Each structure stands twice: as structure tokens, then as C-alpha cells.
């Protein structure tokens, strides 16, 4: 594979127009933010309610297993990011290894357009977080924002307006001040991390008695701390039951360190070398320690029963954050925890907006997507890509809020990303076979094959349990439509390029410009 920068006949232009604004800290922040630790900690109860059984579901062990399954992907992204530090990094090496048709169609389905329903999901997660925080602080008027749209008392219109307004504001920031967009993510991540630390310390200081007093103080008929703890009689760990939660960790956390590689041409210094392994380690601790704290303070039996109790989860938004706020002895502490929860979730949204525009830019550079999507303003922002993302995502927020009412209605669409990551692993293995020697070759091939196997398994889990993972018409229809759209678009663009006298496939044999 050549490494020269080809002329304008191959790529749309000779430079992306983006600048190197992303430090190592920024890269870690955007990776961990995109790994959705805030959502993973706050939405677990809704998934526990959907499981066929919660007997033996251990979230700490589940997080450990999921992190272990992510190790091959970590190796792949670390090694390949050093070789392809470009905009849309994993798309670049996958399309160069597996060919333009496979690379273009799978990326359009699995990342470029899949990110939009994911952002819609996260936008609604932010709304639910704001509503739950308001309730925990004593503002009962915010109940409508905290409840899923299919639950009596919910306010789908308010959820749509708030979620869409927040999304519009973040898109405008990235259009007008793209450098500020990266700095906001780092700020949100830092504030969110502080909130998680405060929550953990608050729970540890409150102890078992604090949890008992909080639950009993809710005055829920027939529901006390003791009754919840006694209602669970199963083991503390069952492998089969815990493995049912693997798609949950895949939905929100461990696969998503493609964030920093997607802005590869904007990374400064050593950011492209170390951001992936550091991000995986940081995300593991941020997710696992809170779950472990809940088990330690509240007890495994109580925590499992509470996270699968419909009244606590649906009506009181029970999760790690609300429990910590509930046991807090002062308003300031509760507010700090609530703020951390909200901004940690907003950070996911903030970077999702950036990453989708980078994949659009990369694919338009290869002449697969329309050239207008590659337009970069004088401020260094891919404006048209942002506006397209804005239009589609706002529509999906509305569909999820009004027609389906639950976050899980969009879960199924994330299956497309599992397919994408499987092909990314396969692409790395093919690249290793063709271009590497010795230890590097063996490492890339083995890690790539293992990554492909892990995500094939996760795709199967999504399909095998549609009732848990949002196997709705909206989700599956979106995945199928985007795949066929990609296939048709590739055929059309190739036909147009052939008539114009240049071969579109040449782009997939060269490394694109920075």
C-alpha cells in the first residue's frame, strides 16, 4: 500500500482543512466521554428490567469480562492508529484493506449514519438525567422529564424540546468555534469525573444505614430496604446471566475508543500513541468502581433487587447517581453529584457531534459521499456535515420520544456498529497479513481476528434477544435502509466517476491527506 499523498484526481482536495488542536488529555477525554460511562451508570436499571432473569447478574464481573473482551480491539486501535493517523482513522484502514465497496457501505451503515440514532438516544438520556436530578433535589415538576415516554406522567413534548435544544446548541458551538467544542468535552469530562468521585465518597461515608434510611424514607408501599434485600435469593454471580449484559457494555462503553482515532489528523504529539490504552483503563475504573461501591455499601442482594424493581427504576430513576444523591446529607453535595451525572452524559453528545462529522468528511474525501459534506469553513468546521447530522438526529429524537417512548427503541440500531467493528478487526488482520512482518504481523492478525470474533458474538446477542436490545421496526429498519443506501450510493458514485474519466477505487489504494 502506498503512503504518498495523491493528487486531486484521486481525493477531493490535498488537505482536509482541519488543524491539530487535540492534546493527549483531550484525546483521552473525548474517548472516555464517547465511551458513555455516564449513560452506562445511569441507564442500567432499564436494561435489568428487560432481562429474562437477574439472578446472578454481577455488574462488576460483567464490566471486567467486557473490558477483557475489548483488549484485542485496544491492540488493533493502538497499532493501526500509529499507522493511519487520519480523519476517520478506522474507516481509512478498513476501506484500504477490504476495498472501497465494503469499507464505504459498512462504515456508512455502522458509524456515519448509525451515530445519529445513538446521539438521539444520548440526547434523551441527558433529558432523563436532568429530570431525575431535579426530582432528587425536590423539584417534583420535573417528573415528566424523568419518566420514559411510554410511562404515565411522562412529557414527551418537553423531552423532545429539551433534548433537541441542547443538541442544536452543541452543533452551533462546533460550527462557530470548533476548538471550543474539544475544550468543552474536556471540561465536561473533568466535571463529570469529579461528580463520580463525590458520589462514591458520599456512598462510602453514608454506609449501609444511609442506604436503608433513604429507601425507607421514600415511603413506597410494601417496599423497604429489608424487603428488597430479602426478595433476592440467588447467587452473587452466574456466568450465563452476566453474559446477557455484554451488549449493554458494548452499547455504551468499551468499544467506543474509536473516538480519538476518528480525529487522527487533529491529534498533537503522542496523543495518537497512548490515548486508546489509557482510555480503556480510565473508563474501566469509572464504570466498575461505582458498581462495586453500590454492592459494598448496599449489599449485592439489595442492589440487584433495586435495579430490577419497576417502581424504583421507572418512578424514582434508581441508579448509582440517584442513590448517592439520596444518601447525601446536604443539598450542595447532591447538586454536585447531579451536575456530574448531567455533564458526563452531555460530554457523550458533544463528541458524538464531532466524530460523525469527521467520518462524513473522510468518506466525502474519498468521493463516496457528496463533496459538499467535505466543506470546511474558515473556522475549521465541517459545516454541511454538522447540519445534516442536526436534521436527521432531531427527527430521530422526535420519533423515539413520541412514537416509541423508550430509550431501548434505539438500542437495536447500535447493532450496526457491532457489525462495523467486526469488519474493522478483519481489516486490521488483512492489513497485518499484507504489510507487516514478524511480531507486528502476528499481533495484528491475532488481535484483528479476535476483535472480529467478539463483535460477531455481540451481533448475535443483539439478534437473539430483541426484546432486551430494542429489536424494533425503527431500529432494524434504520440499519437495513442505511446498508442498502450505502450499496446503491457506492454503485452510483462509481458509475459517475467512470463516466467522468477517473477511477474512484484508486482512493482506496492510497492513504488520504491530512
Question: Which role fits each region the language model picked out?
Answer:
Residues 1-60, 64, 70-75, 220-224, ...:
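Membrane-interface "cap" regions at the ends of multi-pass membrane proteins
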Residues 14-21, 89, 176-187, 255-291, ...:
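Hydrophobic, small-residue-rich membrane helices and short re-entrant helix-turn-helix hairpins
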Residues 22, 158-222, 255, 279-284, ...:
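Membrane-interface loop-to-helix entry segments
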Residues 44, 61, 193-194, 199-207, ...:
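A generic transmembrane alpha-helix motif of multi-pass inner-membrane proteins
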Residues 46-47, 71-79, 83-167, 345-359, ...:
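Hydrophobic transmembrane alpha-helices that form the core helical bundles
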Residues 47-63, 138, 144-156, 178-188, ...:
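Transmembrane helix-loop boundary segments of multi-pass membrane transporters
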Residues 92-95, 99-100, 137, 141, ...:
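TM-loop-TM module centered on a large, flexible mid-protein loop between adjacent transmembrane helices
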Residues 142-153, 157, 186-334:
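Helix-loop-helix junctions that connect adjacent transmembrane segments
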Amino acid at each position: 500500500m502506498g503512503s504518498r499523498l495523491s493528487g486531486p484526481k484521486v481525493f477531493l482536495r490535498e488537505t482536509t482543512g482541519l488543524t491539530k488542536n487535540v492534546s493527549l488529555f483531550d484525546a483521552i477525554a473525548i474517548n472516555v466521554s464517547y465511551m458513555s460511562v455516564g449513560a452506562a451508570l445511569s441507564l442500567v436499571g432499564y436494561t435489568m428490567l428487560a432481562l429474562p432473569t437477574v439472578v446472578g447478574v454481577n455488574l462488576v464481573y460483567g464490566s471486567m469480562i467486557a473490558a477483557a473482551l475489548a483488549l484485542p480491539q485496544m491492540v488493533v486501535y493502538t497499532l493501526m492508529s500509529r499507522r493511519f493517523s487520519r480523519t476517520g482513522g478506522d474507516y481509512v484502514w478498513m476501506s484500504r484493506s477490504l476495498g472501497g465497496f465494503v469499507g464505504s457501505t459498512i462504515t456508512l451503515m455502522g458509524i456515519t449514519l448509525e451515530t445519529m440514532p445513538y446521539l438521539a438516544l444520548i440526547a434523551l438520556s441527558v433529558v432523563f438525567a436532568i429530570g431525575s436530578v431535579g426530582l432528587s433535589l425536590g423539584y417534583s415538576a420535573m417528573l415528566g422529564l424523568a419518566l420514559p415516554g411510554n410511562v404515565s406522567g411522562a412529557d414527551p413534548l418537553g423531552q423532545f424540546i429539551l433534548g433537541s435544544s441542547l443538541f442544536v446548541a452543541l452543533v452551533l458551538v462546533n460550527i462557530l468555534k470548533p476548538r471550543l467544542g474539544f475544550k468543552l468535552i474536556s471540561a465536561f469530562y473533568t466535571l463529570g469525573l469529579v461528580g463520580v468521585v463525590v458520589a462514591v465518597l458520599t456512598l462510602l461515608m453514608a454506609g449501609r444505614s444511609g442506604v436503608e434510611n433513604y429507601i425507607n424514607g421514600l415511603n413506597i408501599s410494601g417496599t423497604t430496604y429489608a424487603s428488597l434485600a430479602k426478595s433476592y435469593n440467588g447467587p452473587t454471580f452466574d456466568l450465563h446471566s452476566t453474559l446477557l449484559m455484554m451488549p449493554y457494555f458494548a452499547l455504551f462503553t468499551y468499544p467506543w475508543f474509536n473516538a480519538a482515532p476518528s480525529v487522527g489528523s487533529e491529534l498533537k504529539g503522542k496523543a495518537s500513541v497512548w490515548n486508546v490504552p489509557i482510555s480503556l483503563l480510565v473508563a474501566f475504573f469509572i464504570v466498575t468502581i461505582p458498581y462495586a461501591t453500590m454492592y459494598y455499601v448496599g449489599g449485592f442482594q439489595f442492589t440487584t433487587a433495586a435495579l430490577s424493581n419497576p417502581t424504583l427504576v421507572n418512578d424514582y430513576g434508581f441508579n448509582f447517581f440517584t442513590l448517592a444523591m439520596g444518601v447525601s446529607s446536604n443539598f450542595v453535595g447532591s447538586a454536585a453529584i447531579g451536575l456530574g451525572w448531567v455533564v458526563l452524559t452531555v460530554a457523550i453528545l458533544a463528541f458524538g457531534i464531532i466524530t460523525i462529522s469527521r467520518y462524513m468528511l473522510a468518506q466525502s474525501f474519498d468521493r463516496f459521499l457528496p463533496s459538499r459534506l467535505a466543506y470546511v469553513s474558515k473556522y475549521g468546521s465541517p459545516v454541511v456535515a454538522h447540519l445534516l447530522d442536526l436534521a436527521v438526529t432531531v427527527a430521530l429524537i422526535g420519533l423515539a420520544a413520541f412514537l416509541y417512548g423508550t430509550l431501548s427503541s434505539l438500542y437495536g440500531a447500535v447493532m450496526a456498529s457491532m457489525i462495523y467493528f467486526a469488519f474493522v478487526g478483519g481489516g486490521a488482520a488483512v492489513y497485518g497479513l499484507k504489510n507487516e512482518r514478524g511480531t507486528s504481523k502476528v499481533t495484528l492478525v491475532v488481535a484483528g481476528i479476535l476483535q472480529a470474533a467478539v463483535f460477531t458474538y455481540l451481533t448475535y446477542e443483539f439478534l437473539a434477544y430483541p426484546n432486551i436490545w430494542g429489536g424494533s421496526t425503527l431500529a432494524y429498519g434504520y440499519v437495513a435502509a442505511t446498508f442498502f443506501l450505502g450499496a446503491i450510493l457506492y454503485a452510483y458514485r462509481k458509475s459517475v466517476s467512470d463516466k467522468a474519466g477517473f477511477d474512484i477505487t484508486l482512493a482506496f489504494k492510497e492513504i488520504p491527506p491530512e
